[in-house]
């Protein structure tokens, strides 16, 4: 089988993967490349959510074709974001409307199946991604802040 010259491939995922490969060629340590997609769990995951994860994963897969560097895909939930409006498809709009401007992870889940409104939507996202066999790691901003994982970075920001 003839070897593909990926530098000549014009498909945008390969173009983006090559940009990443070229950029990291200047970095000494190349143990792992992380591809990340963000999700705002203010409502149910939808086709736009799927498209963002799919596009990121397409670039990741192309990167794996042109590189031997291991990769991870992270689905990062911005579940500390505030609720700006009540989604039209939510079953308890009158209850949810009382929590406008509240962090998504501090809003109760009115279906009583999850720890919070954000946890409900995060689980819907994970079910959605699992249905399509995405290889990813899920990270919640609420849990990341609570764990202290961001503390040293936040302190650096405050010092500058």
Regions found by a protein language model. Name each.
Residues 102-160:
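Active-site neighborhoods of enzyme catalytic cores
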Residues 40-41, 78-82, 143-146:
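Short, internal active-site loops enriched in acidic
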